[in-house]
Structures are given as structure tokens and as C-alpha cells.
From Swiss-Prot:
UniProt-annotated glycosylation sites, renumbered to this chain: 201, 421
Known tissue expression: Widely expressed. Higher expression in liver and kidney.
E.C. number: 3.1.6.4
Protein name: N-acetylgalactosamine-6-sulfatase
Family recorded in the similarity comment: Belongs to the sulfatase family.
Active site: residue positions: 76 (nucleophile), 139
Post-translational modification: The conversion to 3-oxoalanine (also known as C-formylglycine, FGly), of a serine or cysteine residue in prokaryotes and of a cysteine residue in eukaryotes, is critical for catalytic activity.
MF annotations from Gene Ontology: metal ion binding; N-acetylgalactosamine-6-sulfatase activity; sulfuric ester hydrolase activity
The encoding gene: Galns
Cofactor: Ca(2+)
Length: 520
């Protein structure tokens, strides 16, 4: 039998989901809510004692909670690249080979970005007639060839980099904010952030962008993909005036409360427009909470060890909620091992599209889990740069390498695991365990404090199964061309498109490409 066309595949999916109506089929809208440095333990539904996330808790009560959902990397840029490609960063190029097991991302001086050879989710969704918008942080490269509107998005309001600053526009420029193809200002200038008080109106702007886009696409009767990637919970944390000082958790809690309020507005609009049953919404975060910034500017990873920058559970296990009234039964909890890469494949399935067949796709289609409660065996791989640090299979997690950061950094105050030191586990030298991995049973020991005895039958059984999975993975792995090796002061945001109209072009320094330095 001939392969199904995209249209035939869509008809089959919509028929199975009960979404066919008179006239042409309309695939479900897709809304992905990606937070920045938000921890697993920041949601009331996950046990945060202040219970300051009523809308997210309601979202979970009306949908499906995933307690075992993971990012693809303990850092922002590689995780976002994995979400939009469905592929591990080691495959899509979002890693560095400048040093062993180093986290890398896309600061202003990076020369690399998302390769044209990668197929991004919005590019593929266009084939099914979707209109695509990104709101917030892109972080997959800021040079012209990496612009999100060149990679499938139709609209953009947000920034190419994180909201670090303010800078003097001499040694380093302030980060631009874009409206579609051109900048419309810069952070700390046209888009102020008060570093002393934490006041900024950005979340309100990002929320209104989302609401306006939904209303416009509903009026057009056009299926839409909204990628809402806001960064209020990334240090320096910010919140708007009406939320500052309202949380029991300090400024970080203020930001979480505002995000929760915004999520409530988005879900309410979908319901008021009568399109909630035809809109799939998923909430998660790019990596674990940055404990180094806690408590005032960092979140909670609940019972899990360490945080952002590490491949312990606190660095990569994320809050995750799926919401789709009328399709995902209310009040469900799934212990399926999920990954941020699954959002790529699941979204394609919703649109009636198959993932690309010319490359390895790491993301799974979670619709069978969400709609029918099916469980799938799959490993979770924990990479740090070019190094496979750990793997989880079922309840067992095997550490092939352990490292938090160097003793030098640690003694100078950089601590990714404050108050959580575990002897022989949270090491400050790179320790190899590939012959005899440290293995933990995450069901009994979610904090990774008590490794199984090497001599136990349980260890030997877990080792046998884990070793097979790792060997199969590494045997077939073809790493992508590393994108995060070369830096250059001349490629920073000196003169973004549109700067001429605003009189905000800056003169770049001489181009001097050099190897990026990644400390940890």
C-alpha cells in the first residue's frame, strides 16, 4: 500500500481523536509554554508549600501531570534546540568540544546557532497549514541566518538572548527586543528592567502577545502554533509592579505568581473562545532551577539533587503538565518517562505529520500515553556537552560520570548544589564511572544519595540492562557539527536589523574569532 500523504495522515489522526467536522479538517492548535530555570518543586501540585500556583495546579487537575519529565540538557540553549528539533543536542550541534563535559549556550559573542540542516517544528507544521509565533527568548543563535522567522516562525516578539545587563553599549551592547524581522528596542532602554527592585513589565507584554495571537488566529479560523518561551524566572528575576512583594518566596516567587496568572489568562481565553477542546497545551521548563541564585532569584527542585548546570535529577527533571479538555481525561498522573524532545514528535502527530525519516529523532509521540494511558519503555540520556554523563532506564539511573564544577569555582562561591553535598557523588573533579557506574533507584532514592551496592543482585541486573542501552546508543551515534565552539566580540548585538530606524546602531569591534571558554 502506498504511504499516506500528510493530508491522509491528518484525516486519520483527527478521525481517531473525534475532531472531524463538516468541511475541511482543522488540526488542533498547539500551545507550548516553556519556562526558564523553573524547578520541579515550584508548583503547588508538586508539593511547593506556599501553594502560589493556583492556575497551574488547576491545569494539572484538568489534565495530566508528568512527574518524570526531563529536559534534554541542564542548560537553556541546548534544551531549546532539542525541543524544536526532537533531537539530542549532541545530534543537532548544540554542544561544545572545547573541553570535556562542558555546558555551553548562546551568549552574545557566540558565532554558532541552529544549523539549516535541522528541521524545526514550526517549519514542519507549516506543511499542515499552521501559523506559528514565538513569544520570548529564542536562544538558538542571534546572527541573521539564525533568525526564527528563517526557521519556520511567522511572528516573533522577544529577544535572541537572555535579558542580562545592563551594559554600557561600548564593551558590550544591551540585548535587542524584536518585533518580527526587526528590533524595536533594547532591554534596560526601551524595555526597562530595574535590577534593584526587580520591576519589569515584560511578562505582561508577553502575555498580551499570546492573547492577541490566539484571538487573531481564531478569527481567521487558522490552526496555530504558539511557542511561549518567557524568561522571568531566569536571573536577574523580574516581575511587574502589581506582583512584586506578593509572594512568600521573595522576588522569584513574585515572578512565578505572575507566570501562573498569565497561564490562567491563556487557558481562560481558549475556553471563552470555545476552542479549548481543539487546543493542546503543554507546560514545562528548559532545565532545573538555578539553585546558585536561590533563594531570592532561584527556584526549587523539590526532593531532587542539585540544579541547573548538573546532570543530577535537579538539573534536568522538569515540571510538566498536558492540558486538552475533552481528550486528556482530567486528574491524570502519568509516570511515563517523558522528554522535552517528545513535544516535537507529539506536536507533529497532532498535526497529522510524521517526523523526518532521514535522521534519528529522539522524541517519542506521547499521545498514546495522554489519551490511552499507554506506557512506553525508553531511556533518558543525560548529556553535558559532548559527554554522556548518565542514563535512566525505568526506575534506575546510572551515572557514568559525576561532576558539579571545579574545586576552584566551588571555593570561590559557585555552588550548584548548595547544602546538598553527597560524598563521592557531587564531585568537584570529573570522576569516571563507566566500568562500574553509580546506580540509584530513583523510586526509593529520588535524591540520589544512596548508590546501590556493587555486589548486589539488583545492581548487577540494572548494570546489565543499562550497559546494553548505552552501548547501542553510542554505537549508532553520529554527533552533529558542534555549534558552540567559536566566539567573537564582533558578532554581538551591535547593529541588529531595524537599528537604523531607531538610531540605535552601534559600531562593532574588529572581528577576532577565538575558542569559547566554558568554565563548567
Amino acid at each position: 500500500m502506498a504511504a499516506c500523504t500528510a493530508a491522509q495522515q491528518l484525516l486519520l489522526v483527527l478521525s481517531a481523536l473525534g475532531l472531524l467536522a463538516a468541511g475541511a479538517p482543522q488540526p488542533p492548535n498547539i500551545v507550548l509554554l516553556l519556562m526558564d530555570d523553573m524547578g520541579w518543586g515550584d508548583l503547588g501540585v508538586n508539593g511547593e508549600p506556599s501553594r502560589e500556583t493556583p492556575n497551574l495546579d488547576r491545569m494539572a487537575a484538568e489534565g495530566m501531570l508528568f512527574p518524570s519529565f526531563y529536559s534534554a540538557n541542564p542548560l537553556c540553549s541546548p534544551s531549546r534546540a532539542a525541543l524544536l528539533t526532537g533531537r539530542l543536542p549532541i545530534r543537532n550541534g548544540f554542544y561544545t568540544t572545547n573541553a570535556h563535559a562542558r555546558n555551553a549556550y548562546t551568549p552574545q559573542e557566540i558565532m554558532g546557532g541552529i544549523p539549516n540542516s535541522e528541521h524545526l517544528l514550526p517549519e514542519l507544521l507549516k506543511k499542515a497549514g499552521y501559523t506559528n509565533k514565538i513569544v520570548g527568548k529564542w536562544h538558538l543563535g542571534h546572527r541573521p541566518q539564525f533568525h526564527p522567522l528563517k526557521h519556520g516562525f511567522d511572528e516573533w516578539f522577544g529577544s535572541p538572548n537572555c535579558h542580562f545587563g545592563p551594559y554600557d553599549n561600548k564593551a558590550k551592547p544591551n540585548i535587542p527586543v524584536y518585533r518580527d524581522w526587526e528590533m524595536v528596542g533594547r532591554f534596560y532602554e526601551e524595555f526597562p528592567i530595574n535590577r534593584k527592585t526587580g520591576e519589569a513589565n515584560l511578562t505582561q507584554l508577553y502575555t498580551q502577545e499570546a492573547l492577541d495571537f490566539i484571538q487573531t488566529q481564531h478569527a481567521r479560523q487558522s490552526p496555530f502554533f504558539l511557542y511561549w518561551a518567557i524568561d522571568a524566572t531566569h536571573a536577574p528575576v523580574y516581575a511587574s509592579r502589581q506582583f512584586l512583594g506578593t509572594s512568600l518566596r521573595g522576588r522569584y516567587g513574585d515572578a512565578v505568581r505572575e507566570i501562573d496568572d498569565s497561564v490562567g489568562k491563556i487557558l481562560s481565553l481558549l475556553q471563552n473562545l470555545g476552542i479549548s477542546k481543539n487546543t493542546f497545551v503543554f507546560f514545562t521548563s528548559d532545565n532545573g532551577a538555578a539553585l546558585i541564585s536561590a533563594p531570592n532569584e532561584g527556584g526549587s527542585n523539590g526532593p531532587f539533587l542539585c540544579g541547573k548546570q548538573t546532570t543530577f535529577e535537579g538539573g534536568m527533571r522538569e515540571p510538566a503538565i498536558a492540558w486538552w479538555p475533552g481528550h486528556i481525561a482530567a486528574g491524570q498522573v502519568s509516570h511515563q518517562l517523558g522528554s522535552i524532545m517528545d513535544l516535537f514528535t507529539t506536536s507533529l502527530s497532532l498535526a497529522g505529520l510524521k517526523p523526518p525519516s532521514d535522521r534519528v529523532i529522539d522524541g517519542l509521540d506521547l499521545l498514546p500515553t495522554m489519551l490511552k494511558g499507554q506506557m512506553m519503555d525508553r531511556p533518558i540520556f543525560y548529556y553535558r556537552g559532548n559527554t554522556l554523563m548518565a542514563v535512566t532506564l525505568g526506575q534506575y539511573k546510572a551515572h557514568l560520570w559525576t561532576w558539579t564544577n571545579s574545586w576552584e569555582e566551588f571555593t570561590q562561591g559557585t555552588d550548584f548544589c548548595p547544602g546538598q553535598n553527597v560524598s563521592g557523588v557531587t564531585t568537584h573533579t570529573q570522576e569516571e564511572h563507566t566500568e562500574l557506574p553509580l546506580i540509584f533507584h530513583l523510586g526509593r532514592d529520588p535524591g540520589e544519595r544512596f548508590p546501590l551496592s556493587f555486589h548486589s543482585d539488583e545492581y548487577q541486573d540494572a548494570l546489565s540492562r543499562t550497559t546494553q542501552v548505552v552501548q547501542e546508543h553510542q554505537k549508532s551515534l553520529v554527533p552533529g557539527q558542534p555549534q558552540l565552539n567559536v566566539c567573537n566580540q564582533a558578532v554581538m548585538n551591535w547593529a541588529p536589523p531595524g537599528c537604523e530606524k531607531l538610531g540605535k546602531c552601534l559600531t562593532p569591534p574588529e572581528s577576532v574569532p577565538e575558542k569559547c571558554f566554558w568554565a563548567h
